[in-house]
């Protein structure tokens, strides 16, 4: 999904659910969620995750005490949360400084272009980035931000 499409869906989501209350989202009419731009599968994921938050199964107040890998494992145990989403939570919500979101195709391709890597496919580019980014520790999130800035002509305010 493009940044522009995601921003549009997020704007419509906030217009419909301004408080972003887990209980309200858990019991939301699926048609209303589809109307803001979510697919049937995403509606299942969003309402399921909201139910987990509402039930207290997800405890964001405890996230800061977890190591990156432990938090990533916790998040990806939720249906619909994959490695990319977990990495975005680590970077943007938890502000972890050393996250390298190798599942971000835009990041991988932009790094290959910026560094002039002649890797034949995405898998090879991803591995080249993983190895190269070791030198960025413990600031891989920061390096990721700079590559994303290069990717987007217009800065995105997060």
Regions found by a protein language model. Give the residues of each.
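Alpha-helical ds-nucleic-acid-binding substructure associated with the helix-hairpin-helix region
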Residues: 1-79
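C-terminal accessory module of base-excision DNA glycosylases/AP lyases that mediates lesion recognition
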Residues: 44, 64, 68, 83-158
């Amino acid at each position: 999904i493009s940044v522009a499409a995601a921003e549009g869906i997020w704007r419509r989501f906030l217009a419909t659910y301004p408080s972003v209350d887990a209980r309200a989202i858990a019991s939301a009419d699926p048609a209303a969620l589809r109307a803001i731009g979510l697919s049937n599968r995403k509606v299942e994921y969003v309402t399921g995750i909201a139910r987990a938050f509402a039930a207290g199964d997800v405890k964001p107040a405890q996230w800061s005490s977890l190591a990156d890998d432990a938090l990533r494992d916790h998040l990806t145990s939720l249906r619909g949360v994959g490695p990319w989403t977990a990495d975005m939570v680590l970077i943007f919500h938890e502000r972890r400084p050393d996250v390298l979101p190798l599942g971000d195709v835009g990041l991988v391709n932009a790094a290959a272009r910026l560094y002039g890597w002649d890797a034949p496919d995405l898998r090879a580019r991803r591995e080249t980035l993983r190895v190269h980014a070791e030198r960025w520790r413990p600031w891989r999130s920061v390096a990721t931000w700079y590559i994303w800035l290069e990717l987007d002509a217009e800065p995105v305010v997060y």
